Amino acid sequence: MSHRFLKRKREHLKTIKPDIYLLGEIWHDASQWLQGDEYDSVMNYPLLSGIHDFFLDKTMKKEEFEYMVNRCYTMYMQQNNDVLFNLLDSHDTERLMNRFHDLDKFYQQLAILFTLPGSPCIYYGTEIAMEGAHDPDCRRCMPWSEIESEENQKKIATMRKLIMLRRNEKVCRSLHFHFPNGYENDRCVEYIKLDEEGNKIEVLLNASDEEIKVKGDGEVLFAREFDGEILGVNGTLIRRM
């Protein structure tokens, strides 16, 4: 669709329903569509690609992850970052679980999704770590007959924990974050989220092949492969500081 058409479409739709949310599916830098007169937001495919690349490519260092995230959040105006449609898989991509076949890596990436600015989106089936290769396999039917299985209920419960963390902790939704680089390990990602009231959480992801001794203390809000001191390989830790 042309920019001219989108501008006229927005003007017409906003006249009918002023609070309508116009979302675009743009796979690259969408700045020219987000000038306030076309889309309100876009699907954040650059963030999806950057997260996947870091976890797929073991040669990438945490500084490259940091650069990617910062780039994604400096491409657009701040009001756009508030409502970016953040996703890890969709009807047009290979499913998240299909890329890694590893629940720990799967939840590491979901922890990122639920602690960065924007609007987290879960593709149907991701709540049970459903697999599926590239289109059309990524659009396979939801296995409703298997939903009540013990394994799937555990996965759904874990997803609910992340959703409730996002909902209950304002700092998870905050726009403010930084990377302190407090660990020497090249693939130990650490970032701090802050809100306007001074609340802080730390997100720690061990994407290396070595265990990491965690520094300091804090209230654990979400964890995998963490025993209270050591964050295991592919471990995740979100804690209040």
Spans of features found by a protein language model:
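C-terminal beta-strand-rich structural cap/linker in extracellular carbohydrate-active enzymes
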Residues: 227-241
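Solvent-exposed beta-hairpin/edge-strand motifs
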Residues: 217-226
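Acidic/polar loop patches that form or flank catalytic/metal-binding clefts of enzymes
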Residues: 23-24, 120-124, 170-176
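Carbohydrate-binding surface patches
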Residues: 180-216
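Beta-sheet entry/capping signal
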Residues: 12, 19-21, 83-85, 119-122, ...
